[in-house]
C-alpha cells in the first residue's frame, strides 16, 4: 500500500468483529512502532497487550466512572451499558514509559510517534485502531494499573484499541493545512 493512501485512508475504528488479532499481526504492528523517531534515540516505549475480555471491560467500566467524576457535563453520555470506551475491541494496547518528570514530555511525544507508526501498519494489514484518550485517567488508579500489569515505575502514555473492523470506514474530508505564515 502506498504511504499516501495509508495516511489518507486510516480512520479511527469504533466497531469490531470478534476475530482476534493474530500474534503475527500484533508483532508486525509493534515492530512498526519501534521504528518511530525518538528523542535522543531513547526508545522509551514499552507495550502491554491485553486480550482478556474481562480486563478490557474493567478498563471500560473504570474509565467511564472516572470520566463522569472528572467531567460532569459528560456524565449522562457515559452512564450507559454500551461500551463507549473500548467499543468491544478484541485487543487493548497500552503504550507505557517510565515515570520521569525530566523526560515526561519527550516520552509522551515519542509514544505518540510510535503509535502513529503502529496505526499506519495496522491499517496496511487491514486492521482498525482507535486512540483511547480517556483511558489515561487510569494513571490515577494504581490498583487498576496493577491489574493490567503496569509496573509501578511506568505510566500509560497512549492507550489504543485494535481489531478487525466490522465495516469499511468512509473517507472523511480534511481541512487544508492551516499555515499561520511562511517566513522567508
Model-derived features: positions:
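A generic structural signal for short coil/turn motifs at secondary-structure boundaries
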Residues: 16, 102-106, 169
Amino acid at each position: 500500500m502506498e504511504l499516501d493512501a495509508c495516511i489518507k485512508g486510516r480512520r479511527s475504528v469504533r466497531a469490531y468483529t470478534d476475530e482476534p488479532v493474530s500474534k503475527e499481526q500484533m508483532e508486525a504492528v509493534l515492530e512498526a512502532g519501534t521504528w518511530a523517531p525518538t528523542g535522543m534515540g531513547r526508545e522509551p516505549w514499552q507495550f502491554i497487550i491485553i486480550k482478556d475480555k474481562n480486563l478490557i471491560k474493567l478498563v471500560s467500566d473504570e474509565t467511564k466512572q472516572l470520566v463522569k467524576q472528572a467531567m460532569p457535563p459528560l456524565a449522562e453520555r457515559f452512564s450507559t451499558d454500551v461500551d463507549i470506551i473500548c467499543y468491544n475491541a478484541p485487543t487493548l494496547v497500552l503504550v507505557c514509559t517510565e515515570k520521569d518528570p525530566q523526560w515526561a514530555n519527550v516520552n509522551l511525544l515519542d509514544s505518540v510517534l510510535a503509535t502513529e507508526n503502529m496505526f499506519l501498519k495496522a491499517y496496511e494489514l487491514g486492521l482498525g485502531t482507535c486512540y483511547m484518550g480517556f483511558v489515561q485517567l487510569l494513571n490515577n488508579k494504581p490498583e487498576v494499573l496493577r491489574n493490567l500489569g503496569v509496573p509501578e515505575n511506568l505510566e500509560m502514555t497512549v492507550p489504543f484499541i485494535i481489531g478487525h473492523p466490522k465495516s469499511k470506514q468512509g473517507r472523511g474530508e480534511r481541512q487544508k493545512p492551516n499555515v499561520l505564515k511562511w517566513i522567508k
